[in-house]
Amino acid sequence: MTNNTQRPSGRQADQLRDVRITRHYTKHAEGSVLVEFGDTKVICTASIAESVPSFLRDRGQGWLTAEYGMLPRATHTRSDREAARGKQTGRTQEIQRLIGRALRSVFDLEKLGARTLHIDCDVIQADGGTRTASITGAFVAAHDAVARLLATGRIESSPITDYVAAISVGVYDGLPVLDLDYDEDSQCDTDMNVVMTGAGGFVEIQGTAEGVPFSRDEMNALLDLASDGINTLIAKQKAALEQKGE
């Protein structure tokens, strides 16, 4: 794609930020990842509990749930911890539900057995795209947790049916662009988050016009950008999971 506008980052319109996925980042969790989308950094852990929520008791299947949070100084100015305020914001609840839905879309929960996979995504530095980075990193953490279940004989086959990743796209200065950082996200005309599977299925599309409505052609261009970006992210997930000796 030709870059007809100057992005604040200097990237091409279809260029991702530098993406890094570091596995086994913490000691105790069955799966843990540091995922970096440029200056956005998120620690994702996957923990196994040998129980399920009450609504699934005696149903013969497992559950996957997610929590999301940000360190007080993950952004330009300090924010109080939500625990100190006594409640989660609507944004936090929306994002953690999105992460859970995204991962459940590629899990056969019956194969997980009567156990719960808890996903925790903690943003240590935010520069746009924290929810998409969280989904992309959390999948790798979940994959490692499942590998632990397989290695210890607690499940017979993997419940994971496909890969899943997410990316942001938007219309900035009239041009569809991929993987918005904070400067772009705060100034764009359209902001969209897209979650897709490795097979190309859409799990979720969240799109909003920031004052200027977007056209069907612009939406199609954004989805094409997102699809290509997610293919690249899934290739990075696979490369991370193929690394030995970690």
Swiss-Prot record:
Catalytic reaction annotation: tRNA(n+1) + phosphate = tRNA(n) + a ribonucleoside 5'-diphosphate
InterPro entries linked to this entry: ExoRNase_PH_dom1, ExoRNase_PH_dom2, ExoRNase_PH_dom2_sf, PNPase/RNase_PH_dom_sf, Ribosomal_Su5_D2-typ_SF, RNase_PH, RNase_PH_bac-type, RNase_PH_CS
Top-level taxon of the source organism: Bacteria
Listed GO biological process terms: rRNA catabolic process; rRNA processing; tRNA processing
Enzyme Commission no: 2.7.7.56
Keyword annotations: Nucleotidyltransferase, RNA-binding, rRNA processing, Transferase, tRNA processing, tRNA-binding
Keyword Chaperone recorded: no
Residues the entry annotates as binding phosphate: 91, 129-131
Pfam families assigned to the protein according to its UniProt record, in alphabetical order: RNase_PH (PF01138), RNase_PH_C (PF03725)
Enzyme class at the top of the EC tree: transferase
Coiled-coil ranges from the UniProt annotation: none
Gene3D superfamilies (UniProt xref): GHMP Kinase, N-terminal domain
One function term, GO molecular function aspect: 3'-5'-RNA exonuclease activity
Family: Belongs to the RNase PH family.
Cited function: Phosphorolytic 3'-5' exoribonuclease that plays an important role in tRNA 3'-end maturation. Removes nucleotide residues following the 3'-CCA terminus of tRNAs; can also add nucleotides to the ends of RNA molecules by using nucleoside diphosphates as substrates, but this may not be physiologically important. Probably plays a role in initiation of 16S rRNA degradation (leading to ribosome degradation) during starvation.
NCBIfam families, per database record: RNasePH (TIGR01966)
Binding partners and assembly: Homohexameric ring arranged as a trimer of dimers.
Protein name (Swiss-Prot/TrEMBL): Ribonuclease PH
Organism: Paraburkholderia xenovorans (strain LB400)
